[in-house]
From Swiss-Prot:
Zn(2+) binds at residues 138, 141, 283. It comes from Bacillus subtilis (strain 168). The keyword Cell division does not apply. Residues 82-372 form the Peptidase M14 domain. The active site is at 344 (proton donor/acceptor). GO terms for molecular function: metallocarboxypeptidase activity; zinc ion binding. Keywords: Hydrolase, Metalloprotease, Protease, Zinc. The lineage of its organism: Bacteria, Bacillati, Bacillota, Bacilli, Bacillales. Belongs to the peptidase M14 family. CDD domains: M14_Endopeptidase_I. Its cofactor is Zn(2+). The keyword Magnesium does not apply. This is Uncharacterized protein YqgT. GO terms for biological process: proteolysis. GO terms for cellular component: extracellular space.
Length: 376
């Protein structure tokens, strides 16, 4: 349950005035209160414990109550660099929707082991464009979740204080572009890499065998069934079938057919039910951005990739064509002829050491900001 304050219902008759007094964008405040009851006021950018105290009678009462609870972009929670397993992601999402009540959250599916796969959404009521971002398709690429959640908190907080980043107005982006974000596509696999097979119960022996009895699971990319989720999509899947492992493995097995795994099915349905205009999938490693697929990508991809390169400080390099099929982005471009980008974060051997996080984040954040922008 999101945290709200109890106010005199009449105060909400003029949300524009409330927004002005609290120095919150009016559309942002309206978005935060779309589902609020008449006595509830949700205030983005504040840390509010569930409030069931006395009814606040005036805007001045509200301001006095909120003042010591206001967050800033420099707050440690916004700036933190954190490793996330599945339970940490759930806790973070709970706080995000509490502090930023204009963010909605829903379960789009469940993993093999029954863990929820969450989608976060943020965007103005009249936003025309749609962007989707995701992280941790591959288990040992868990650092992508850390990058995406840190950036999303930065984006949400910048909306509350209307602080521009990379020359972009966050409020303009919010009002024009609806963002869909899945921070942890492969929760079982990420937990296996970070926490080991001890937490996997009856499947421990099977997982040790699929991992070829290595001392750890650092090379594990697949889901818990030993299927590579990013080789599961119906776009020339047969090519991957004939050249990749033919049985479950710690990496690269594309499954016995496309879309056999609950995680890939959830992502497939998410896109088919509401196709975005642009898609970004975060992976590691190589400091490259794959943007083409069989010549089916739209013309604007070539221009956008140049801006991505510049905003990364020319650390990332665009690569139009690679020898890869049946990926999430591949399928998206193949079937929708829209922009799709695989951003390969960092350099080194997966899982990348977390000491790289600051460098990776600094090179990536501008790309994520630019991804929300569309030329009129």
């Amino acid at each position: 349950m999101m945290a709200f304050i109890t106010v005199k219902p009449e105060i909400k008759n003029n949300l524009a005035n409330v927004a002005k007094e609290l120095k919150i964008d009016e559309e942002l405040l309206k978005s935060a209160n779309r589902s609020a009851q008449k006595h509830q006021l949700y205030c983005p950018g504040y840390v509010i414990e569930e409030h069931s105290g006395k009814e606040l009678q005036t805007i001045q009462d509200i301001k006095r109550f909120l003042q010591p609870r206001q967050l800033k972009l420099s707050d440690s929670w916004i700036e933190q660099e954190k490793i996330y397993d599945d339970s940490a992601v759930e806790k973070e999402i709970k706080k995000i929707i509490d502090v930023f009540p204009f963010v909605s959250c829903r379960e789009i599916g469940r993993s093999v082991l029954g863990r929820p796969i969450w989608e976060l959404k943020a965007g103005g009521e009249h936003a025309v464009k749609k962007v989707h971002m995701n992280a941790s398709f591959h288990a040992n690429e868990w650092i992508t979740t850390s990058v995406l959640l840190k950036w999303f908190k930065e984006y949400c907080m910048s909306l509350c204080c209307n602080s521009p980043f990379f020359g972009f107005s966050p409020i303009k982006l919010f009002n024009s572009t609806s963002l869909s974000l899945v921070p942890l596509v492969n929760p079982d696999g990420v937990d296996l890499v970070l926490n080991g097979s001890e937490v996997m119960g009856a499947r421990r022996d099977e997982l040790e065998r699929l991992n070829e009895h290595r001392p750890n699971f650092n090379e594990w990319k697949a889901n818990i069934n030993g299927v590579d989720l990013n080789k599961q999509f119906p776009s020339l899947w047969e090519i991957e079938k004939y050249r990749k492992p033919t049985a479950p493995s710690y990496r690269d097995f594309p499954g016995i057919s496309p879309l056999t795994e609950p995680e890939s099915i959830a992502m497939y349905r998410l896109i088919t039910e509401n196709p975005p205009d642009r898609l970004l999938a975060l992976h590691t490693q190589g400091e490259e951005i794959y943007w083409g697929y069989k010549g089916l990508e739209p013309e604007e991809s070539a221009a956008v990739i140049k801006e991505f390169e510049e905003l990364s400080g020319n650390i990332y390099k665009g690569v139009r064509d690679i020898d890869s099929y049946a990926g999430f982005r591949d399928w998206f471009i193949h079937h929708y002829f829209k922009e799709g980008y695989t951003v390969e974060l960092g350099k080194g051997q997966n899982p990348l050491p977390f000491q790289q996080f600051s460098h990776i984040y600094n090179a990536t954040s501008g790309i994520l900001w630019r991804a929300l922008f569309f030329h009129e």
